[in-house]
UniProtKB/Swiss-Prot annotation:
InterPro entries: Formate_THF_ligase, Formate_THF_ligase_CS, P-loop_NTPase
Keyword Iron-sulfur included in the entry's annotation: no
Entries under PROSITE patterns matching the protein: FTHFS_1, FTHFS_2
Family assignment from sequence similarity: Belongs to the formate--tetrahydrofolate ligase family.
GO biological process, any: tetrahydrofolate interconversion
Chemical reaction(s) catalysed: (6S)-5,6,7,8-tetrahydrofolate + formate + ATP = (6R)-10-formyltetrahydrofolate + ADP + phosphate
Residues that coordinate or bind ATP: T67, P68, A69, G70, E71, G72, K73, T74
Protein known as: Formate--tetrahydrofolate ligase
HAMAP family the record matches: FTHFS
SUPFAM superfamilies documented for this protein: P-loop containing nucleoside triphosphate hydrolases
Length: 557
């Protein structure tokens, strides 16, 4: 019998009306703004009324360094949420929205997989409720107003060479990384060099995901630094009077999206910054709403714990005042073998020796999460090629690192395949969490970058030229020294070289560029060759996506 694809499983799901899902959380129908029958936004008025309620337990799902195909972190997040509900706990899932770039590129969608999916899967992986389009429009409105201001006399005296605000689109397109705009003569403005980033790297995306409410959203938008004058003094979004119009475009996008899992459990899907080039977490407003409505909230942070979890702890939890109760590190036998030196085409063959070598990567991530004072458990996301000897080797290694490991079959079995992990998470969440960020607010910006590099990546030093160091000092003098840092680097390694696997020690982290995200409230350090506008692979997933003769989508995964 052929194995069903994710899209076939999702289509066969028996979805409940979204009002019924909301009612299970105590959300009245009038507080929902429906987008069809199976998805809705939760109104701001209802969310404001939740203030004062006690919070549930916050559970983070993170992972080891992934293979290019991902290791099922979202699948495990969904499965764990279903598993908690299965054992009688009131649980909600909080995940990010999907970007079109990876969907048509290499990684695929962001709705989970197998029997642990959020539905409607096709909508979620495409336009969903239009949030990303609103973010793209708001971002590019500001870009248009910058060039328009210069065209009509440049009263703010913006230096065209020092405009830092680029344009965005939600697609992988390397051709747009560096562009020249305003060509074509006097009628089109003053030519200047700029470029595009992918929408998920936009500061507007980060602002939407970190803002408390609409008022905070507009205030943060106004704080965006768009560029500098000749005397190097900053020009803000509020100086261009753009923040109000941007907030109008984002008004509906600020409301969290409610959907359901295949097993009809509630899921908030809202926001979608990448963890390698941004802070990698779903929105604060969705997480806070879920914490007021459920006893357990299961959320994820992008890629491995060196990126997503570190930013979840040091940026999201710090800025939003959140305190996680437990963390799950997702590992797969195939990724551990890859970290142990096995080629991608050989990952289906048993190799316990390589697996044990690769387990050093798992150990590093366990230690890093423990370093934040959060209790840890390991989820072994099962693949059919795993052998019993390999699974036992992972269990034994994790136990030696002080973390229990559970084999999870949620992809194939749904919540029934992850009950043991759910029980353990409940147990861990009842133990005291000694959560604390990695560094204090008052540490200098460059020292914060060094702290992340040395303690999380185990680097020997951070390489940054005097221009970067001077820029950081200038920002500190301007009052931005207390901001956390957001390290943008490859997700495949603790180094900036994607080919170096395992748990390397003593390497250097080169910082190529720094960017001030004053509205979001952090400083970005772009490390190595990471790009904020990805490119498509030689054989993009888009080549396999099409409509069948009945108009149904095929090839989406």
């Amino acid at each position: 019998m052929a194995v069903q694809t994710d899209i076939e499983i999702a289509r066969a799901a028996r979805k409940k009306p979204i009002q019924e899902i909301g009612a299970g959380l105590g959300i009245p129908a009038e507080a929902l703004i429906p987008y069809g029958h199976d998805k809705a936004k939760v109104g701001q008025g209802f969310i404001r009324g939740l203030e004062g309620r006690p919070d549930g337990k916050l559970i983070l799902v993170t992972a080891i360094n992934p293979t290019p195909a991902g290791e099922g972190k979202t699948t495990t997040t969904v499965g764990l949420g279903d598993g908690l509900n299965r054992i009688g706990k009131k649980a909600v899932i909080c995940i990010r929205e999907a970007s079109l770039g990876p969907n048509f590129g290499m990684k695929g969608g962001a709705a989970g997989g197998g029997r642990a999916q959020v539905v409607p899967m096709e909508d979620m992986n495409l336009h969903f409720t239009g949030d990303f389009h609103a973010i793209t429009a708001a971002h590019n409105l500001l870009a248009a107003m910058i060039d328009n201001h210069i065209y009509w006399g440049n009263a703010l005296e913006l230096d065209a060479r020092r405009i830092t605000w680029r344009r965005v689109m939600d697609m992988n397109d390397r051709a747009l990384r560096d562009t020249v705009v305003n060509l074509g003569g006097v009628a089109n403005g003053f030519p200047r060099q700029t470029g595009f980033d992918i929408t998920v790297a936009s500061e507007v995306m980060a602002i939407l995901c970190l803002a408390d409410d609409l008022e905070d959203l507009e205030r943060r938008l106004g704080r965006i630094v768009v560029g500098y004058r000749r005397d190097k003094s900053p020009v803000y979004c509020r100086d261009l009077k753009a923040a109000g119009a941007m907030a109008v475009l984002l008004k509906d996008a600020m409301q969290p999206n409610l959907v359901q899992t295949i097993e009809n459990n509630p899921a908030f899907v809202h926001g979608g910054p990448f963890a390698n080039i941004a802070h990698g977490c779903n929105s604060v407003i969705a997480t806070r709403t879920a914490l007021k409505l459920a006893d357990y909230v299961v959320t994820e942070a992008g890629f491995g714990a060196d990126l997503g979890a570190e930013k979840f702890f040091d940026i999201k939890c710090r800025l939003a005042g959140l305190k996680p109760s437990a963390a799950v590190v997702v590992a797969t036998v195939r990724a551990l073998k890859m970290n142990g030196g096995v080629a991608r085409e050989d990952l289906g063959r048993e190799d316990v020796a390589a697996l044990r070598r690769g387990c050093a990567n798992l150990g590093r991530h366990i230690a890093n999460v423990k370093g934040f004072g959060v209790p840890v458990v390991v989820a072994i996301n099962h693949f059919t090629t795993d052998t019993e000897a390999e699974i036992e080797a992972v269990r034994a290694y994790a136990a030696g690192q002080g973390a229990e490991a559970f084999l999870c079959r949620h992809w194939a079995e749904g919540s029934a395949g992850i009950e043991d992990l759910a029980q353990k998470v409940v147990e861990l969440a009842e133990t005291p969490s000694m959560f604390a960020p990695l560094y204090p607010d008052d540490m200098p910006l460059f020292e914060k970058m060094e702290t992340v590099a040395r303690r999380i990546y185990h680097a020997h030093d951070v390489i940054a030229d005097h221009v970067i160091r001077d820029q950081l000092r200038t920002w500190e003098e301007a009052g931005y020294g207390a901001l956390p840092v957001c390290m943008a680097k490859t997700q495949y390694s603790f180094t900036t070289d994607a080919a170096i696997r395992g748990a390397p020690e003593g390497h250097s982290i080169p910082i190529r560029e720094v960017r001030l995200a004053a509205g979001a409230g952090f400083v970005v350090a772009i490390c190595g060759e990471i790009r904020t506008m990805p490119g498509l692979p030689s054989q993009p997933a888009a080549e396999l996506i099409h409509l069948d003769e009945e108009g149904r989508i095929e090839g989406l995964f």
